[in-house]
Every structure is written in structure tokens, then in C-alpha cells.
Amino acid sequence: MTGIAPIALGLDFGTTNTVIALSDSADESHLISFKGEDSTGEIFRSALCFWEEQSGWNGIASEAGPWAIAEFLGSPLDSRFVQSFKSVAASSIFERAQIFGRPFRFEDMGRLFLHKLRDHAGGQLSKLPSRIVVGRPVEYAGPRPDPALARQRYDLMFEQWGSEIHYVYEPLGAAFSFASWLERPTTLLVADFGGGTTDFSVVRVAEPGSSQRCQPLASSGVGIAGDRFDKRIVDHLVLPLLGKGGTYRSFDKVLEIPGGYFGDFADWSRLALMRNKRTLDELRKLQRSAVDPTPIGRMIALIEHEQGFPLYEAVGRAKRALTASDEAEFSFSGGGVEINTVVSRRDFERWIAEDLRRIEAAMDAALVKAKLEPADIDRVFLTGGSSLIPAIRALFERRFSVDQIATGGELTSIAHGLALIGSDANPAEWSV
């Protein structure tokens, strides 16, 4: 990069990770690298850690990204670790999280996250470009997502970042990035596999030098991605040890334990928030009436001992191992709970089979909207961490030839493309 002031900033605010790119021309962008003892380079984890401190805002201090992880690991019982909070952006059910008795709305957490992110950029973001391009999913995560509510919350989250803020579908950012490598006119299908959603865009790419290089034809998405695959692992390997499928006594009846507690426990965005007096009191009451109280006791212990992040890490290790091997060891130890078992890729693929069918249906919806058949697609670009899962790759290889499919920049391509869109003469053409 030269010393020229950047024209635009592209922000890929992801469910799992956040990446930022700056552009100073229509065909060049570079990533912001975060430096420091706990830094993970260009990838900033979309997570927050809170702890009580008199000098903090309203008596609560906070950290974000890899520094949030470091704070949590240093003092897990005295902190609250929140991750995947983007997943509740479009949820009308979520109003606020109670953290150490203080309410935090989505936009409160979002503004804190952005403030810490800028702090850790080491001056690279001290002066923001006038044009900010923020990625958003085509379809938000969660049951009955409300995109208008998500837009309102995003506006509040980003209101201090400038007046010219554009929201662009995340797969379009990846398409713009990949198009810079193409040397001939191409009909391109982009699939973005994030933490909370899977999104598709079909784009017509003109030859280099054209006045409008990329023309979006259609987009679609579904609220299923990496976190859902994690949930399947937790559902099959962890929750049966915590009381799922068990029963409790209510007067003269024996009833199945309600599934809501298990749904919350298997959702990374909600697990940390279960550590509150009301939920723990309800679980202790349930434990007293359970036919077998021991499993519910394990759940209570995991929540009280803040074992959400260690469990997340254990699930992630097993899932990553299954991308390269037919079997993986799932090993977790914490809160008095020990799990050591072997999981096969065949079992994992069986658990996520219905999720894959819904993902494939979303891809078909994008093609239908674009009025194209699979044979009309010249290239397919897969991005996002879950694109590395063999079953995901196989889904595309059934529909397209292997030499049509490209991968790369799984965690960074969207931010690159968003920054390039921001340097375009009229980014509003891409905005939604």
C-alpha cells in the first residue's frame, strides 16, 4: 500500500470472525492486521468478555476478539464470555442480555465490539474513510428472523462510524474479490459458508476493463452454517449426558424434560447467557424433580463453571479433524464432566444431512431467481470456514465439474471484496 488515504473500508462482521480491509483504488485492497501479545493477525474473533471492575462502564469492563479469549482464560469464573452474538441481530425474541445484572442490547454489544476492534488496530483505524461497506447475510440466522429489526440494530451499532454506510450481501463481496482473478466473461456462483448462515449469489462478470465488471443476478440464503453443525455434535455427544431425553415428575405424571434448556445450551450465542439466577434456579428445581437428577447437575456445573468456550473449542477441534480424517476423537474435560469418544465422519454427515438438503435448496433458489440452470454456471467459488467440510464440497461436485470449483481466502475474501465495492464509483448499486 502507498501513503494514499483509503477510499473505503470493507467490514466482514461475521458470526465467528471479523475481518477488515481498506482500499485506495478500484482494484487494490489490503487487510488490517491486529498486533499484540494475544493477536491472531488479520482475523478478529467476534467475541466479547465482560468482568466487574469499578473503573469500567457502569461497573463492567470488557474486551473483544482474541483479547476477550485471553481475559476469559485468565479468570473464567469471574467473567462472562459471549460469542456468536451476531446470531441474535434479527431475533425479536432477544431484547437484552443480563450480564452481571446490567442489560446489554445487541447494539450495545456491537458498539463495544467495534470500539475495542478499533483500539486493537494500532492506529490503522484512527481515521476512518468516509465510505464504509458492511457485509450482511442474505438470510439472517434464527427462527423467524426479522431483517428490518436487524437493519435497525446494525444502524445503531455503526452510527458512530460515519454517515455513508452501505450494506452489501456477503457473497457479493466474495464475488467481487474472486472476479479480480478472472480474465474472461464468466457466470459465477458464489457460496459463502459462515458461522450463522450460508448465502449464495449469482453474478455475471464482464471482461477486465469493462465499465461495470460485475452484475448481480440473484441471491439467496438459509440460516444454517458452522454453528448449526456444531450444534449437531453437541446434540449427539454432549446433551444426552446433561439430561436430554430424561424425565421428571410433575404431580402424579412423569414427563420428558423440556427441550428449551438443551436448545439454549447447544447455541453458542445463548449458552453464556444461561449463567443467570433465574435460569439456574429453574434448572435446580428441575433437578430436584428429575427421575435421574445427576445429568441436570452436570449441566448446572458446566454453566456455573463457564465451560461454554472450552466446549466450543473441543467441538471445533473434532469438526476440523473430520475434514481430514474418517474419524476424530472428541475430548472434553471441565466442570466435573469428562467426555472421551470417537466420532466418525459418516456419523457427522448423517447428523447434518437435513441441514445439507436445506443448503442445497437455497442454492437452487438462487439459480431459479437468476433463471439459470447449473449448466449455465461457468465457475463456482466457495468461501467461509465450513466450505472445507468434505460433505459440503461433495454437494457441489455432484452438481458441477471439479475444475469449475475454486476455493481460497476462506476467512478474508469477503472483506477484500467489500472494500473494492466501496471504491467503486457507485457502491449504492450493490447495497441492500
Language-model features, listed with the residues they occupy:
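Phosphate-binding glycine-rich/basic clefts of nucleotide- and phosphate-handling proteins
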Residues: 41, 205-334, 430
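Adenine-nucleotide phosphate-binding core of ATP-dependent small-molecule kinases
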Residues: 98-119, 300-308, 337-366
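Gly/Thr-rich phosphate-binding beta-strand-loop-beta motif of the actin/hexokinase/Hsp70
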Residues: 2-29, 179-214, 382
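Conserved phosphate-binding/catalytic loops in two-lobed NTP-binding clefts
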Residues: 160-168, 375, 394-420
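Phosphate/ATP-binding catalytic cores across multiple sugar-kinase/actin-like superfamilies
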Residues: 112-125, 171-182, 318-321, 351-377, ...
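Conserved phosphate-binding catalytic cores of ATP/NTP-utilizing and phosphoryl-transfer enzymes
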Residues: 1-7, 165-191, 416-427
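Early-domain small/polar-rich strand-loop-helix modules and first-structured segments
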Residues: 1-96, 220, 225-264
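Glycine-rich phosphate-binding loops at beta-strand->alpha-helix junctions
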Residues: 134-147, 307-308, 375-396
